[in-house]
């Protein structure tokens, strides 16, 4: 019988954890990165590795930055090969996963929902 929920395997979770540690280390040191990322504090919110371990989707959120979303994406994509090489040196696998960066809209969506709830005329129907 097929599972209805998709769960990550132990290998996917382990690889995502290693990639997260490596990305944090690289972002702290600032080595091998595009110069635009030096003064751009980023948070890696989550990493999702595909079932075949070939692709790692890395979600990030910038804090207090002067750079636009497109500039950050361009800088991360310019540094992608150096980051992948650094990850390759840390893992013991036949293939190193391709790194893809995505902006995490979770924080923006939470702020929008909070504003909608504050500004709405939502009333508890049980109190009427």
UniProtKB/Swiss-Prot annotation:
GO terms for biological process: maturation of SSU-rRNA. It holds the Pfam family RBFA. GO terms for cellular component: cytosol. It is found in: Cytoplasm. The keyword S-adenosyl-L-methionine does not apply. Monomer. Binds 30S ribosomal subunits, but not 50S ribosomal subunits or 70S ribosomes. This is Ribosome-binding factor A. It comes from Rickettsia prowazekii (strain Madrid E).
